């Protein structure tokens, strides 16, 4: 597999420290609010990457943190702890907020068919690990105590900016939140490893440390958790591109200074989900959730399909029209799969090889999910029996996670019910094999039969808005997409 490496700005063959095993780390959510669908784009693509690695035979140990302390409203170690901010907003304790939004996050992940990582570790559970790392950094001169806090000294590094393609507004992290500069820092880019009560008197969560009662900085949490569960050598670090600087930059600085050797060679960054007003952001108060998509009638897997249609290193523009187009494409795909007969032939493994190779090449080409999706249509057009097509689609869906066969089976059952009801009424529906549309056409007929013409006209207009044209014929109706 060849992946783009954000640290080298090149595509290269993905290699691991231990052959056949991948130590993978994912920056998890700060659980002070619901995850928005921009956040979840990153987790969808990281999920596909993990599944692709497993598909290729790797033993993957994927670790994710849950940030429940220490992430301030500015990435420059200023502002209020986001967890405290969330607790105040909802008049609850920090731990109540953390548990509620952690549960909500994983509920969203389940709906999006995102596999739960092998290890999920709240930041508050590894305080001893952070203190151990900070003590060594102090002893070796990489950290200093000032104003009641412990800072990492970036001037000790030969090279600090690892990801030099970050945005200018990311460099001005202390400015963009409208907060005061931290005057205790020796250098502009120094960052806090440990806060004490001298920083925030109202901090809810505090622990004893050699430097006084306090709490860890955001960046040290990921290093400590990864070293505990992934070991000294991390193969693959994932996250949103907005975390490249300063968060991932600081992780590298403190981890390699502590370990005395290179830490993680491969960095996988997923780009932004943008709206008409720019990057989706909780801090701006403008964000969409999975629950909102569901309220508007979208299966969350439509959003997953939407994400997979674009490459992870390209900014993805979200509009309702774009999501509608993804829904139409997904529904058509499911309808075509539903039309396959699982009893038509037996699975022919030999005939799968060419398309399996094409699918594999798409994954190996920097996780080209849009190309991988085209292989689904190649399967449907291939000269092979239906049983083999279904087996191949199921094989590819181990990576894509689109629930293709289960959704197709549900559509078959729905179609059977509609056909049964249509037959019982003597009404013949001819269309493109979409049971949801068939059901609406039948409902329109029943409304007309009951002389509820307003309801019948409303259904016709709703179908037309979806691009469906219905023509009444003797003994039934014919519908088509226009």
Please name every model-derived segment.
Residues 54, 138, 464:
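Anion (oxyanion) recognition and catalysis
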Residues 279-281, 287-482:
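Structural preference for alpha-helix termini/caps and helix-kink/transition segments
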Residues 59-61, 141-147, 383, 469-471:
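Short, well-structured beta-strand/strand-turn elements
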């Amino acid at each position: 597999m060849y992946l783009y490496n954000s640290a080298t700005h090149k595509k290269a063959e993905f290699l691991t420290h231990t052959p056949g095993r991948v130590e993978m780390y994912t920056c998890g959510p700060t659980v002070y609010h619901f995850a928005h669908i921009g956040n979840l784009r990153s987790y969808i693509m990281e999920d596909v990457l993990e599944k692709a690695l497993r598909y290729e035979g790797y033993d993957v140990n994927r670790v994710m943190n849950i940030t429940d302390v220490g992430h301030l409203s500015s990435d420059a170690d200023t502002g209020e702890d986001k967890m405290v901010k969330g607790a105040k907003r909802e008049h609850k304790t920090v731990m109540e907020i953390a548990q509620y939004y952690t549960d909500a996050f994983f509920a969203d992940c389940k709906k999006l068919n995102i596999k739960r990582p092998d290890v999920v570790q709240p930041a508050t559970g590894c305080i001893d690990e952070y203190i151990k790392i900070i003590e060594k950094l102090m002893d070796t001169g990489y950290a200093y105590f000032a104003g009641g806090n412990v800072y990492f000294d970036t001037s000790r590094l030969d090279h600090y900016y690892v990801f030099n393609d970050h945005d200018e507004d990311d460099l001005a992290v202390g400015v963009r939140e409208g907060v005061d500069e931290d005057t205790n820092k020796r250098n502009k880019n120094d960052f806090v490893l440990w806060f004490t009560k001298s920083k925030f008197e109202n901090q809810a969560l505090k622990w004893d440390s050699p430097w006084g009662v306090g709490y860890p900085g955001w960046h040290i949490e990921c290093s400590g958790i990864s070293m505990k569960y992934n070991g000294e050598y991390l193969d693959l670090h994932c996250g949103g591109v907005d975390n490249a600087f300063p968060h991932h930059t600081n992780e590298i600085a403190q981890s390699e200074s502590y370990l005395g050797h290179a830490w993680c060679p491969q960095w996988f960054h997923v780009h932004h989900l943008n709206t008409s007003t720019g990057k989706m952001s909780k801090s701006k108060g403008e964000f969409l959730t999975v629950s909102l998509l569901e309220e508007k009638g979208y299966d969350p897997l439509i959003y997953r399909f939407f994400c997979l249609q674009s490459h992870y290193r390209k900014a993805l523009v979200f509009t309702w029209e774009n999501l509608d187009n993804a829904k139409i494409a997904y529904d058509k795909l499911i309808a075509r799969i539903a039309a396959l007969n699982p009893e038509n032939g037996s699975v022919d493994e030999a005939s799968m090889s060419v398309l399996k190779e094409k699918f594999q090449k798409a994954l190996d080409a920097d996780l080209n999910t849009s190309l991988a999706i085209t292989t689904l249509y190649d399967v449907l057009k291939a000269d092979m029996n239906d049983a083999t097509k279904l087996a191949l689609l199921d094989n590819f869906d181990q990576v894509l996670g689109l629930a293709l066969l289960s959704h197709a089976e549900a559509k078959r059952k729905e179609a059977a019910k509609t056909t049964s009801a249509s037959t019982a009424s003597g009404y013949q529906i001819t269309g493109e094999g979409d049971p949801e549309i068939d059901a609406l056409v039948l409902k329109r007929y029943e409304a007309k039969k009951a002389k509820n013409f307003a309801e019948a006209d409303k259904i016709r207009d709703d179908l037309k808005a979806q691009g469906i044209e219905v023509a009444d014929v003797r003994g039934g109706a014919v519908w088509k997409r226009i």
